[in-house]
């Protein structure tokens, strides 16, 4: 409701608003439809993010984990939070950050390329999402999901092939590898 999602709100490209039998939104937003709500959620502060990294780091280290990979940083503040965590000595894990394509222009503007960093924190490939997940029944599949309320549910493709090709070329032209989330068949 706070995001203004109503029965008249169309599904965004690459997303789906789950609706009840009367066409009313149920509150479940799949894939890119989540962005409708993310826009109205207050952003965490830099200190909140550093504290969250500290807590996660402590739990991982206590479990004997020494390395991690953030598979989808999409905001400049996330990069800064990781850097502050390193500066404050709270990031003990060796961490590689996959960056979402939205963050690529920002990093390039700073002269940052894949591999930038040190043994504690490094910028990795660009992360793209081609489809959703199996558990959410949003992976792009060649046959509809069985026992789904929507008998024609073939999942969600986030991008057209042309859009995906363009994003891959942009990343490669900038010197980045691409890691693509592609769960469906």
Region locations from a protein language model:
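Divalent metal-binding segments
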Residues: 1-110, 124, 128-184
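Acidic/histidine-enriched ion/cofactor-binding microenvironments in catalytic or ligand-binding pockets
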Residues: 115-122
